[in-house]
A protein has these predicted regions:
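Cytochrome P450
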Residues: 1-444
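Short flanking/linker segments adjacent to small metal-binding domains or redox-active Cys/His motifs
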Residues: 166, 428, 621, 697, ...
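FNR/FR-type flavoprotein reductase catalytic core
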Residues: 531-689, 695-698
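Short Fe-S-cluster ligation motifs
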Residues: 410, 418, 738-768
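Local cysteine-cluster metal-coordination motifs and their immediate loop/turn environment
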Residues: 572, 707, 711-735, 746-761
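Ferredoxin-reductase
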Residues: 446-542, 559, 593-595, 606
Length: 768
């Protein structure tokens, strides 16, 4: 069924629909083994779904196409995920039979309806609240292994640590008795070669022998656990669940999962860690950044997983005629969905080949898969990688790759990591020799997808300049003089001010990235942010900054703009007005304030925009007549406003007769209050892509419930202001409480902000 659907004999070579690149594709040799993503750049650009005669598979390479395959585990069956990609010899098959090898269904390759009941039954040990208990063990092992070579000045990170520690963690997580760990360690790699590799005929019997022994010994250890399943670990937990749900968790399933679990929890993390260290040390500036600021480690891990993850591809079986990326795929076809290629798709990741640890959507990577077959152990892997990086950046920040080493990889289609990573350093420069107390410092481990609050950069305060009564302009730049990130009118940044985080709109020139400017009003009722800026912040100080991000975007297709700013709301508006002028658009600006002395940026505004500006001062008695201004709708006109709530409310009332979505506003603050269980109700959230239904308590946000259930989702402000936690809605009416969506978007009911919005009824369904 997986044969090429093209009659090559009839077509000969001329005109054959299989392109030269597709015909030449061989995942076992050459470019794919060196760099899978780079080797398939031609496919992402020209032929995102192609048939490989060499492999007998359809190959899928773009992000959205790969994700759509993951999303539908009925149409695209995972049943062949563990099928041997290369047929084995009769001798190897006989060798496996000698050991009663019966590796069958696991979490990875099981179809519905059996898969999800088992996944739900066995999920609990993987949730964040349970994984916390493993952190001390991971830290202890990491410290012990680094201690062994810290004073030697040279190490092979793979042989001396990264292969061993994840395996030991995996065995502890599974609950394997200490006395059986060494034996199981010796068998693990054979499973990878047996399933995803192309061993030579003469190697197949030896590989099969090792796999058979692995299977047999795993069964022996499992039987030992059955005699006393009261201990900690996933396998004792599974045995206890089996006693309650014997039809869901069967004997054969536990045996298969015992073996598969060791490999899954071990090799993927070991390879991902080796890839990460190579990538970071090859990008020295980035390595030095995380050494200086370990709070960047969680997102550095995500970017490493995206850029150079350990899982290159998965396989699926097509159960019905379908179309992927505009290409008709017949029933029975086999798919190779190349996640490493998807992770480098420019259509989803800007400048996808760049290694950017501040990339805000790094955690969209598909290295852990997606949906109902997403890796259950993803957060254990994240924990290990974060702790590894923390230990090395703290203890051996001066470590470097040994020059001119050749990186080799175990040839296979799906899993990759260097066989060796050789590093060297001068032990005399080890920081702990001068200051042993650094060994006591600990960076918090982020269990789960990193929040955008973890993605910060250090900026220097160049100046704090008064620009109106009670308003200062703060000028920020990169300490090393590098350009700051690009931004567009309406963008804001998040600035950490002491223990607080506050959002401020950018009001400088987007074309001048040597610095940013924000303007801050001192608020008498401030929770501390503006007070800190006005009373503490000085030139020469450094701050942590995140962003820029833009949830207040200017519509480039509008024919005309009306800008209305109230007080400090001028900051995003002035950047928008500058852009309108630069692009030759028709526009007018209405700037409202209590008194001209309190109106920031007034001189620049009038100098740059002249008669386009109208000043409305309460003290001067010329308040803006909003109903008169907006009495007559004008085709092609878009209204943008930032200011106090009373201004925004008045504008909303005055534009009720305008075309929908003519008015765009940005709020200063959120009006969200703490959830009051007496006034809220519990409800269900169906996660259609993951095949799960979770409960949201009356005093719990959807965001909190998602994270407690091991579902990755971003967030930042968690006040309904920034839009980071948006999730697609498939069914059910949403009680929208955010300040992000427009009236039309709310009415369409296609998305919700999970940090604040809730279900109107008993259930909603999300595309997560």
């Amino acid at each position: 069924m997986s044969a090429c659907p093209i009659d090559h004999k009839a077509l000969q070579n001329m005109g054959c629909p299989v392109s030269a690149n597709a015909a030449a594709f061989d995942p076992f040799t050459g470019p794919y083994q060196v760099d899978p993503a780079a080797s398939l750049r031609w496919s992402r650009d020209e032929e995102p779904v192609f048939y490989s005669p060499e492999l007998g598979y359809w190959v899928v390479t773009r992000y959205e196409d790969v994700k759509s395959v993951f999303r539908d585990n009925i149409l695209f069956s995972p049943s062949i995920a563990l099928e041997k990609i290369t047929p084995v010899s009769e001798e190897a098959t006989a060798t496996l039979a000698k050991y009663d090898y019966a590796m069958a269904r696991t979490m990875v390759n099981e179809d519905e309806p059996a898969h999800m009941p088992r996944r739900r039954a066995l999920m609990d040990p993987f949730t964040p609240k349970e994984l916390v208990h493993h952190e001390p063990m991971v830290r202890r092992l990491t410290r012990e292994y680094v201690d062994r070579f810290i004073d030697t000045g040279r190490a092979d990170l793979v042989d001396e640590m990264l292969w061993e520690v994840p395996l030991t963690v995996a065995l502890h997580f599974l609950g394997v008795p200490e006395e059986d760990m060494d034996e199981l360690r010796s068998y693990s790699i054979a499973h990878t070669v047996n399933t995803w590799g192309r061993p030579a005929v003469e190697e197949q019997v030896a590989v099969a022998e090792a796999v058979g022994k692995f299977w047999q010994y795993a069964g022996t250890v499992l039987e030992k656990m059955r005699k006393d399943p009261s201990g900690h670990g996933w396998m004792p937990f599974g045995i206890r669940v089996q006693q309650e749900q014997p039809d869901v968790v069967t004997d054969s399933y536990l045996h298969s999962m015992m073996m598969a679990g060791i490999v899954a929890a071990h090799e993927t993390t070991a390879n991902a860690s080796a890839n990460a260290f190579r990538l970071l040390l090859e990008n020295r500036r980035v390595w030095e950044e995380i050494c200086a600021d370990p709070s960047l480690i969680p997102n550095a891990v995500e970017e490493c997983l995206r850029h150079s993850g350990s899982v290159a591809a998965w396989r699926r079986l097509v159960t019905d005629d379908t179309t992927i990326g505009g290409i008709d795929i017949p029933k029975g076809s086999k798919l190779l969905i190349v996640t490493s290629s998807a992770n480098h798709d420019e259509r989803h990741f800007d400048n996808a080949d760049d290694f950017d640890i501040r990339r805000e959507n790094s955690s969209d990577h598909l290295t852990f898969g997606y949906g109902s077959h997403q890796c259950m152990g993803k957060n254990l892997a994240r924990m290990e990688m974060q702790i590894f990086l923390e230990e090395f950046t703290k203890r051996i920040p001066h470590m470097e790759l040994v020059p001119d080493q050749e990186f080799t990889y175990l040839p296979n289609t799906s899993f990759r990591g260097p066989d060796h990573v050789l590093v060297q350093w001068d032990p005399a420069k080890n920081p702990e020799r001068a200051d042993p107390s650094i060994l006591d410092a600990r960076q918090p481990v982020k269990i789960g997808e990193p929040s955008k609050t973890n993605i910060s950069r250090t900026v220097t305060v160049d100046a704090v300049t008064p620009v109106a009564d009670g308003v200062v302009r703060v000028t920020l730049s990169d300490p090393s003089g590098k350009p700051l990130p690009k931004w567009t009118p309406g963008s804001h940044i998040d600035v950490e001010l002491g223990d607080l985080s506050r959002q401020y709109s950018l009001c400088s020139d987007p074309n001048d990235l040597s610095h940013y400017e924000i303007a801050v009003l001192e608020e008498p009722e401030s929770r501390g942010g503006s007070r800190y800026v006005h009373r503490t912040l000085q030139a020469g100080h450094t701050l942590k900054m995140r962003g820029p991000r833009n949830h207040f975007k200017l519509d480039p297709d509008a024919q005309r703009y009306v800008f209305v700013a109230g007080g400090i709301g001028i900051t995003p508006v002035i950047a928008m007005a500058d852009h309108a002028k630069a692009t030759g658009k028709d526009y007018e600006i209405h700037y409202c304030g209590r008194d001209v002395a309190t109106m920031a940026l007034l001189d620049r505004l009038t100098a740059d925009h002249g008669d386009k500006v109208e000043i409305h001062s309460s003290a001067a008695g010329n308040r803006l007549d909003i109903p008169a201004l907006l009495a007559t709708p004008v085709d092609g006109t878009q209204i943008y406003s930032c200011g106090p709530e009373r201004l925004l409310t008045a504008l909303e009332e005055a534009t009720a007769h305008w075309p929908e979505d003519s008015l765009h506003v940005e709020h200063f603050t959120s009006n969200l209050a703490t959830l009051d269980p007496a006034n809220e109700h519990a409800f269900e959230v169906e996660l259609r892509d993951s095949g799960l239904t979770i409960q949201v308590a009356a005093d719990q946000t959807v965001l909190d419930a998602l994270r407690a259930s091991n579902i990755d989702i971003q967030s930042d402000c968690e006040e309904g202001l920034c839009g980071s936690c948006e999730a697609p809605v498939l069914d059910g009416e949403v009680d929208h409480r955010d300040m992000v969506l427009t009236k039309t978007e709310r009415a369409q009911n296609k998305s919700m902000m999970t940090c604040c919005s809730r279900a109107c009824g008993k259930k909603i369904s999300l595309a997560l």
